[in-house]
Amino acid sequence: MIGLRPAFSTMLFLLLLTGGVYPLLTTALGQWWFPWQANGSLIHKDNVIRGSALIGQSFTAAGYFHGRPSATADTPYNPLASGGSNLAASNPELDAQIQARVAALRAANPQASSAVPVELATASASGLDNNLTPGAAAWQIPRVAAARQLPVEQVAQLVAEYTHRPLASFLGQPVVNIVKLNLALDALQGHRAK
C-alpha cells in the first residue's frame, strides 16, 4: 500500500495540473492576449453574428464572390463535419467532380476568358477554407460587378482592399477573405445581393 501512495499522489497532481490548471490558464491567457481569436474570430454586423473570419460560407448568388468548394458531408461548410473528400488524385470520381465544378463556374462566369483558378474547382483539406488567392477573386470580378450593377474598377478596388498580404513573402501568399469581402460588398450597397 505504501508503494501506491506516491503513484496515486503523482496521478492526482498531474490530473489537477493538466485537467484543471493548464486549461484554465491557457483559456485566461487567450482571452487576455487574443480575445477576438479566442472567441472564434466572429464577425458582427448590427449586433448580429454574420460569420467567422476563419470559416467559409456557401455563397451562390451571382452578386457574391464564391469561395472554395466545401467537401464537408451533407451541409457545405459544416464545421462539425470538417474534412476533405479523401478522394485520391487518380480517382475518377474526383475528376468528375472537378469537371462538373469547372463547367458550372464557366456557365456562371461567361465574362471570364482565362482558365478557371484551381482553388475554385478543388476543395480544401478541411472543407472550410474561407480564403482565395487574389487571382481567383479577380477572376470573378466581372460577374459580381455585372450582378450588382457596379463598375468593374470599384469591385476590383474592394478586392484589393481586402487582400491580406503576409509580413514577408516567405511567410505565405496574399489571400482574400471571401466572407469579409462579401460583407463589404453588402455594406457598399446597403443591402444583400440577389
Swiss-Prot record:
Q: Give GO terms: molecular function aspect only.
A: ATP binding; P-type potassium transmembrane transporter activity
Assembly, in brief, is: The system is composed of three essential subunits: KdpA, KdpB and KdpC.
Q: Where is it mostly found?
A: membrane
Q: Which family does it belong to?
A: Belongs to the KdpC family.
Do you know which Pfam families this protein is assigned to?
A: KdpC
Q: Which residues cross the membrane?
A: 12-34
What GO terms fall under cellular component here? Answer: plasma membrane
Q: Where on the tree of life does the source sit, at the highest rank?
A: Bacteria
| Keyword set, alphabetical order | ATP-binding, Cell inner membrane, Cell membrane, Ion transport, Membrane, Nucleotide-binding, Potassium, Potassium transport, Transmembrane, Transmembrane helix, Transport
The protein depicted here goes by the name: Potassium-transporting ATPase KdpC subunit
Answer whether the UniProt record assigns the keyword Transcription regulation to this protein.
no
Paired cysteines (S-S): none
Classification from the root reads: Bacteria, Pseudomonadati, Pseudomonadota, Gammaproteobacteria, Enterobacterales
Topology of the protein relative to the lipid bilayer: Single-pass membrane protein
